[in-house]
Amino acid sequence: MICENHTRVTEFILLGFTNNPEMQVSLFIFFLAIYTVTLLGNFLIVTVTSVDLALQTPMYFFLQNLSLLEVCFTLVMVPKMLVDLVSPRKIISFVGCGTQMYFFFFFGSSECFLLSMMAYDRFVAICNPLHYSVIMNRSLCLWMAIGSWMSGVPVSMLQTAWMMALPFCGPNAVDHFFCDGPPVLKLVTVDTTMYEMQALASTLLFIMFPFCLILVSYTRIIITILRMSSATGRQKAFSTCSSHLIVVSLFYGTASLTYLRPKSNQSPESKKLVSLSYTVITPMLNPIIYGLRNNEVKGAVKRTITQKVLQKLDVF
C-alpha cells in the first residue's frame, strides 16, 4: 500500500510511561533491579536443572526450557525500555519495531504451548504414574520442547508481516513502552477490520488452544487426585501441580486482559500496567515460585552453590 501525499513512517516514538525526568530515573532503577533478578533467577534455574543429577527428569527439563524462554522474552523488550527511560530520544526504527514485534509474538506463543506441554507432563505423572517413564521418554520430551519453541513461528510471521505491510503515513507516536500490536495498529491510516479479525483468530488459536489443553489436563488431574484414598498422596500431588498452576494463572490472566478485552475498556495506562505484568513481573516471579515451592529445586540450588564455593576454596 502506498501513502498518497504523505511520507511513509520510517521510525516510531515510544512514549513509554512518563515524561517526568525524576520519575524516569526512579523507574529505570526499579526495572533494572527487576531485570537483574529475572536474569539471575532464570539462569540459576537453567544451571541447576542442567548440572544436578536429581533434576534430570521431564518436569525439570520443561522448567529449564521455560526459564530460557523467559530470558529471551524479556530480552526483546526490557533492555530497550531501560535505554528509553534514560534517553531523550525514545526512537525505534520501522524495521526495529517489526523485529521487536516478531520476537514478542514468537516467544509469547512459544510459552503458551510450552505451558501446555508442562501440564501434559503433570497429567501423565499423576494419572498414569506406572507408565510415566515410558510415555515421557527423552525423545518425546525433546520433540515436545522443539514443537513448543517452533509453534511461535507461524503466528509471529503472519502477525508481523501483515502488520508491517499496512500503511503508516501519519502519526508515529506509539503510546506504549514497546512495539505491541494494538498500540501500533492505532497508527495505521486505513480500515484495519480484516487485520483485527485475523489477529483475534490467531489469538484464539495460539493462546486459547494451549489454554484449553491445560484445562483438560488439569480437569483429569483434579479428578484423579480426588479419587486418591491417601491424604498424603493428595497433598503431594497438589503440591506438584501448584507452582505450574500459579505460573499459568499469572501469564494467561494478564495476557487475556490485553488481547481478549474489548477495545473500549482499555486505556493506554491500564494496558501498559497489564503488559508489565506478563512481560516484566511474571518472568521475574517464575523462578521464585518454582524455587520457593519446590524442595528439590531448593536442594539443588544449595548443592550447586556449595560445590562452587568449595571449588573456589580448592577443596576439590
UniProtKB/Swiss-Prot annotation:
Q: How does it sit in the membrane?
A: Multi-pass membrane protein
Q: Which UniProt keywords apply?
A: Cell membrane, G-protein coupled receptor, Glycoprotein, Membrane, Olfaction, Receptor, Sensory transduction, Transducer, Transmembrane, Transmembrane helix
Task: List membrane-spanning regions.
Answer: 26-46, 55-75, 100-120, 140-160, 198-217, 238-258, 272-292
The residues exposed to the Extracellular compartment are: 1-25, 76-99, 161-197, 259-271
This chain belongs to the protein called Olfactory receptor 10A7
| Principal subcellular localization | membrane
User: What Gene3D superfamilies does the record tag this protein with?
Assistant: Rhodopsin 7-helix transmembrane proteins
Q: Which domain of life is it from?
A: Eukaryota
Entry similarity comment? Belongs to the G-protein coupled receptor 1 family.
What GO terms fall under cellular component here?
plasma membrane
Keyword Transmembrane helix found: yes
Please describe what this protein does: Odorant receptor.
Say which species the protein is native to. Answer: Homo sapiens
